[in-house]
């Protein structure tokens, strides 16, 4: 079970992500953003959190043009599984792999806290072990987590069960309290909370374990 973890200039969560997937039996590779290929046995691509290119211009706006993103787009189009966490979610939106955009938090401040969330849809590889409306706790740490999408596309997200998670108290102003989504084919996932930081009791929550474990093992079966 191999996982390609993409590193951009400014990425800072690659080693947390690497550690998390290694706990579930994943063989992890750190892939540089200038690379033009993925490992030949790659089952899953993860774009971790951080501040790619210092978040200059707009979060993820520069990273979307890196050579590796063309490879990831092809990988996703062929049905490969892709996960974007925090800055990775922003990059996937900028690259057009996920709909919508992430704006500055409504309070204009960086928010770092343990956050209560609610499972919206479990009909996907990422959340299949959870129950609908189940409340979980994951850390968030972002300044630009305010998810925006227009009304027409929001209706499509709902109809296609693409909304994965919602905040219970909407700390950043996101439309419909959305914290995570997937694409229509349900092989590209993005969320602002950090499941890789919630895999051990000593970290305050284990609620992220099943997300990563589910996705890794489903991706291997593809």
Swiss-Prot record:
GO cellular component terms attached to this protein's record: cytoplasm
Keyword Metal-binding recorded: no
Gene3D superfamilies: 3.40.50.880
Main location: cytoplasm
Alphabetical UniProt keywords: ATP-binding, Cytoplasm, Glutamine amidotransferase, Hydrolase, Ligase, Nucleotide-binding, Purine biosynthesis
Ranges of residues in domain Glutamine amidotransferase type-1: 2-222
EC number: 6.3.5.3, 3.5.1.2
InterPro entries listed in its UniProt record: Class_I_gatase-like, PRibForGlyAmidine_synth_PurQ
Family annotation (Pfam families): GATase_5
Purpose: Part of the phosphoribosylformylglycinamidine synthase complex involved in the purines biosynthetic pathway. Catalyzes the ATP-dependent conversion of formylglycinamide ribonucleotide (FGAR) and glutamine to yield formylglycinamidine ribonucleotide (FGAM) and glutamate. The FGAM synthase complex is composed of three subunits. PurQ produces an ammonia molecule by converting glutamine to glutamate. PurL transfers the ammonia molecule to FGAR to form FGAM in an ATP-dependent manner.
Protein's UniProt name: Phosphoribosylformylglycinamidine synthase subunit PurQ
Organism in which the protein naturally occurs: Helicobacter hepaticus (strain ATCC 51449 / 3B1)
Name of the gene encoding the protein in the UniProt record: purQ
